[in-house]
Amino acid sequence: MSMDISAFYQTFFDEADELLADMEQHLLELDPQAPDIEPLNAIFRAAHSIKGGAATFGFSVLQETTHLLENLLDGARREEMRLSTEIINLFLETKDIMQEQLDAYKTSQQPDAESFDYICQALRQLALEAQQQDAPAAPPVVAQPAPTAVAGGMRVSLTGLKANEIPLMLEELGNLGEVHDPQQTDNSLEVTLLTTASEEDICAVLCFVLEPEQISFTTPPTTAAKPLPSAEVVPPPVAQPQPAVVEPPKAPRAKASESTSIRVAVEKVDQLINLVGELVITQSMLAQRSGNLDPVTHGDLLNSMSQLERNARDLQESVMSIRMMPMEYVFSRYPRLVRDLAGKLNKQVELTLQGSSTELDKSLIERIIDPLTHLVRNSLDHGIEDPQTRLAAGKSEVGNLILSAEHQGGNICIEVIDDGAGLNREKILAKAAAQGLAVSDSMSDEEVGMLIFAPGFSTAEQVTDVSGRGVGMDVVKRNIQEMGGHVEIHSRAGKGTSIRILLPLTLAILDGMSVKVNEEVFILPLNAVMESLQPQAEDLHPMAGGERMLQVRGEYLPLVELYRVFDVAGAKTEATQGIVVILQSAGRRYALLVDQLIGQHQVVVKNLESNYRKVPGISAATILGDGSVALIVDVSALQMLNREKLLSAAAA
């Protein structure tokens, strides 16, 4: 009787992805000259677990690739093979091909045969060369614990099995070693397993089908007696394997920790967040309707409403935290990228990661990867110099690249910092002028720096597969703005460059300021609001094309009229009769004219594009406490829209 295990595919895919990521991280930590045994053991365990899972599900190509890699890793950790940078590079390449094979299986396709043949041949060739290496001292010391494990074995007990799972478990245990003395009932199986695999390795393979609490291990009494004679003959070797005997108890603790978490589909979390958002909106409606009640007559009801508001906010914060992920998910891919690209560019770069535990909403985590990757590649290519140039400038030949993340209020700040050559102001201005961009020598360094985000802008002398095509930096800026954030750049010639990204922690809720234009209510993101004031006539200055500037403490700011941008009839058209809100977007400030301020509060963001269509100048919508809809303004687009309206009016 066979068992359909296709239902467990996704569990294997998720765990294999994590194991491959761990494998890459540990490979990058290895020092070829003096490899640490702990990362080697971790890499070996990851490969062994993937191989076992691949065998279980019949993924033969992935199983064979991992088997060859596992044998080489075993030789390396037994010191039967000397590691080198080239060997680690081959292991990293193998990991990449294993990822491609896994991705193919995810889509029910067969992995690429050509890359499979190539990597198998490369690994077999490496194994052949390793056999020819002269390492006489290593085998007697390291190989001694293995016969003890095989001679004694371990008793493996599996409980809570279905009848059709027992043959499958026997087959899986057979893949891990020699099975002896099997004893089974209708729902349990107990065998003696002669294997060199640890309890953790066995659990990793069987837990693709079973839960950790269904698996237990005992040691037959005979195994304790067998190692004693060797202890009398050669005391040091017997003492040396003791850490291996101590390790197995750690495995159950790790599994117990893992069993306290569950995998939940993102769609289910999104549905929960939407429902909590609706609850918050309903609570706001009730609060608004109860606001006019007499507190003496309805004191109990109003107290209950206050308690409901606190509970709703606490529930919303708790549910939102479910979607938060550490920045380590993003940062973990850059050590490999920096290592490979620096080698390709013949540069020496040390990468420092800071704030990897800082959390960000999952939807933003996934969208920030591409922009951040482009900034890292740009720093390596354009920012950090080659060793000769750095030495000539009095710097260390090793460049420094820092990726950091930290919370700042309701935002997250992500920085890419290098100690390279910095931006060449004259070169950027000349290139921008040649491309027809509006520039002047009086521009600040920050304004000159922001020119690199203009469409098609590039200062590279030649086009390569790394840079020079003039695409990418404008996309970086646009993508960040679409996430409700903005980018800033600071540079010092000869000292380096810092690119700063500010993003909201989540796109599901927003701290906003409500403003009114006639009877229309708009929401301004609170992180863009600097201050508000009532303008005076002497502070307003007309400009060509119908635009006006507002002087605020010596600074001239463009005046954007919200009623004009969205064609709101009946609004106050005279600036001195309204209120001006000073906004900052993409490092630039401007004044926004509205009729009145209502107040600030937290709102639940509703996607306007999926429910209606994309509207220029509007990023989303929300439902207010009275049930009406308010539009959330895209502050980065208002200046351009205001200018377009003025030009259209002048042309008419």
Curated annotation (Swiss-Prot):
Keywords: ATP-binding, Chemotaxis, Cytoplasm, Kinase, Nucleotide-binding, Phosphoprotein, Transferase, Two-component regulatory system. GO terms for biological process: chemotaxis. The keyword Cytoplasm applies. Its EC number is 2.7.13.3. The modification Phosphohistidine is found at H48. It catalyses: ATP + protein L-histidine = ADP + protein N-phospho-L-histidine. It holds the Pfam family H-kinase_dim. GO terms for molecular function: ATP binding; phosphorelay sensor kinase activity. Residues 1-105 form the HPt domain. Involved in the transmission of sensory signals from the chemoreceptors to the flagellar motors. CheA is autophosphorylated; it can transfer its phosphate group to either CheB or CheY. This is Chemotaxis protein CheA. The gene is cheA.
